[in-house]
Amino acid sequence: IPTPNAITDSTSARAALAGMYHGLQSLSSYGSDFVEVGDLSSDNAENSGTSTSYAEIDDNAMHAFNGTALSIWSQAYDNINRANEILDKVGALNNFDADTRGQITGEAYFVRALMYHDLVKYYGGVPLQLHPTTDATAGASLTRATVATVYDQILKDLDSAQAGIIDSASTTTVSAGAVRALRARVLLYKGDYAGAESEAAAVEDDFSYELVSSYPDLFTVTGTETSEDIFRVIATPIGDQQSYLSYDYFAKARGGTYTLRPTTNLLAAYDPNDLRGQWNISFAGSRRYGSKYRSITGTEHFPVLRLGEIVLIRAEALARLNRLPEAVAEMNRTQVRANAPIFSLGSNTQQQVIDAIVAERRLELALEGDRWPDLVRLGIAATVLDIDPTQTLYPIPQSEIDVAPGLTQNPGY
């Protein structure tokens, strides 16, 4: 985390940006934990290793001392603090031209919005920290903002990001397309379907992203950029900058740790001819393992935002707006690419189309951390997973409550 006096000009500000992106590579962020729990909490993946923390998450039986729930919370706030440091310091300096200032602060606003959306999906209302902190006791007076207030701040940050960012080409740093894509996701979760459709359409129409012709090409060992990438986190084989997604899913016979694996439920959801099932799930003998990520050297990049998701965001938004022929046409784009059975509108109702799109999201985005948040936002997690409704939010880490007694715990913990 930059010290208060470390950012003095555009060069040091860009170094601070690099540090901010490094935080996203962390094993407690997109390098491992945060991606994995999105499937482990759901019907997509199950614990196959020795981690008691992961076993609790798999069973939807966490307690307030769960180590993974703490690590993803702490890393998200660490990433937020890095963004806040940039925003506060760059905003106070007068030796930046307008374009440089806008680009640098725009990237920081985006990352802060991304982290708060990640947090609100798992924990519900969370504390809003909008300025950097360096004192470990600075959070003693924190309280939780409401979910609605957190969403308001996320959208405000995305507006600020869009106003500042001028770059529209990069996929490894924040671009204008990434801002529109994240806003589409946020609005879908918020239930603003007209807004989500409009933003997703802008991503499709105003930028040069294209679906790759073959699904496996999205997840290359070399991390080659594809036409579908919108924003991705870069991994390098150095300590906490590695991606552990392939290690954790790969069978031990393939050099992995086999910490978690796809469920038989997910396997059964794929048609035998669906290329996504063939790519995402493999077997070592009779033992199934996740094979979406295949760089056992830890260098595989993670697609935080990609066009396949945006297509399905638009499809769902269109369906909820009762524009069913358009919704089905959007959904068919990912089905055709995957050689999967093609859904036709026929006499299907609006709800049946929505259900088909939700099922398609599961198949397209499997093992990318989206299934649990989908089940929760749709209000079906308790039914699908046969769990108590109080288990659909993660516990606020007890160590955080110990420091800030004003933080209330989620029900059931």
Protein language model annotation of sequence segments:
Residues I1-G38, A404-Y413:
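Acidic, glycine-rich segments characteristic of secretory precursors and extracytoplasmic regions
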Residues L17, I80-A83, H117, Y151, ...:
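Inward-facing hydrophobic residues that define packing positions of alpha-helical scaffold repeats
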Residues S41-A45, S51-A55, E197-L307, E364, ...:
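Hydrophobic-face positions in mid-chain alpha helices that act as interaction patches
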Residues T52-Y123, S160-A169, G298-L305, L321, ...:
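Conserved, well-structured interaction surfaces
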Residues G125, L155-D159, I165, A176-Y215, ...:
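Aromatic-residue-lined binding/catalytic grooves and analogous aromatic/hydrophobic interfacial grooves
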